[in-house]
């Protein structure tokens, strides 16, 4: 397991991959702990084989500092969680929390998820979380948004029938973008029946400090889709 984000010329990673220097403890966790709980450097990825004693498998794309990922793993010990995040400081924070909690049901990758998702086995996940991704407000940057046809196809391939995709955002244009991308795809069924279903956090949602900062232009929107 490498500690550098994967480099594929077909993809360009937008935004920073590292902020301030890591502390000595964080660097030690990146050097020593990350290889132990990391994903394989190459070849297919089978989440069930990585964590065979877990009943379900979930993925969080862009986990930031790992607050949601770690809390979900603590609350759901029978689920194996995989987190993918390119930002080194976020990975280091997540490693610190995982180590402190002694969690055995989390695996991490410091990578661009667009590069690593094709390596996952088909129908290998029960749930995918994409929470408050970079909205790329400017129209000329719209193609940088994570939710595109190519990633939608990957979501459909990776989720088991009956699996769930949850996207959350506090940016109206991004919510509209996601609905356009997914609502017309007959592989997914939007689960909202009333306004409360998408304007209130789902019962199993874990609110993070980032979410409470209200950095977007609307209240948080939660879009849950069922894989048919």
Swiss-Prot record:
Its pathway?
tRNA modification; N(7)-methylguanine-tRNA biosynthesis
Q: Name one GO cellular component term.
A: tRNA methyltransferase complex
Binding, S-adenosyl-L-methionine: 60, 85, 112, 134
What is known about what this protein does?
Catalyzes the formation of N(7)-methylguanine at position 46 (m7G46) in tRNA.
Matching InterPro entries, A to Z? SAM-dependent_MTases_sf, tRNA_(Gua-N-7)_MeTrfase_Trmb, tRNA_methyltr_TrmB_bact
Molecular function via GO: tRNA (guanine(46)-N7)-methyltransferase activity
Presence of the UniProt keyword Calcium in the record: no
Keyword Transmembrane helix on this protein?
no
The active site is formed by: 134
- Which UniProt keywords are given for this protein, alphabetically ordered? Methyltransferase, S-adenosyl-L-methionine, Transferase, tRNA processing
Q: Which family does it belong to?
A: Belongs to the class I-like SAM-binding methyltransferase superfamily. TrmB family.
Q: Which gene encodes it?
A: trmB
Please list the reactions this protein catalyses. Answer: guanosine(46) in tRNA + S-adenosyl-L-methionine = N(7)-methylguanosine(46) in tRNA + S-adenosyl-L-homocysteine
- One Pfam family from the UniProt entry? Methyltransf_4
Task: Please name the CDD domains in this protein's record.
Answer: AdoMet_MTases (cd02440)
- Record: residues binding substrate: 138, 170, 208-211
Tell me the organism. Answer: Maricaulis maris (strain MCS10) (Caulobacter maris)
Q: What class of enzyme is it?
A: transferase
Specify the domain of life of the species encoding this protein.
Answer: Bacteria
* Protein name in UniProt: tRNA (guanine-N(7)-)-methyltransferase
Q: What is its EC number?
A: 2.1.1.33
């Amino acid at each position: 397991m490498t500690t550098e984000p994967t480099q594929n010329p077909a993809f360009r990673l937008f935004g920073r991959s590292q902020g301030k220097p890591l502390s000595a403890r964080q660097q030690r966790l990146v050097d020593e702990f990350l290889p132990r709980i990391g994903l394989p450097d190459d070849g297919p990825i089978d989440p069930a084989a990585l964590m065979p004693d877990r009943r379900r498998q979930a993925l969080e794309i862009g986990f930031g500092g790992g607050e949601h990922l770690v809390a979900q793993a603590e609350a759901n010990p029978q689920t194996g969680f995989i987190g993918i995040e390119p930002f080194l400081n976020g990975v280091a924070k997540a490693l610190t929390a995982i180590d402190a909690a002694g969690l055995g049901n989390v695996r991490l990758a410091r990578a661009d998820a667009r590069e690593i998702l094709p390596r996952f086995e088909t129908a290998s996940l029960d749930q995918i979380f994409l929470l408050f991704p970079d909205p790329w407000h400017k129209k000329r940057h719209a193609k940088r948004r994570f939710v595109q046809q190519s990633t939608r196809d990957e979501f459909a391939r990776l989720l088991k029938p009956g699996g769930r995709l949850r996207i959350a955002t506090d940016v109206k244009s991004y919510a509209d973008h996601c609905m356009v991308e997914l609502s017309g795809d007959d592989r997914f069924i939007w689960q909202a029946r009333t306004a409360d279903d998408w304007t209130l956090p789902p019962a199993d949602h874990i609110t993070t400090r980032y979410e409470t900062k209200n950095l977007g232009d609307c209240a948080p929107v939660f879009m849950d889709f069922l894989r048919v």
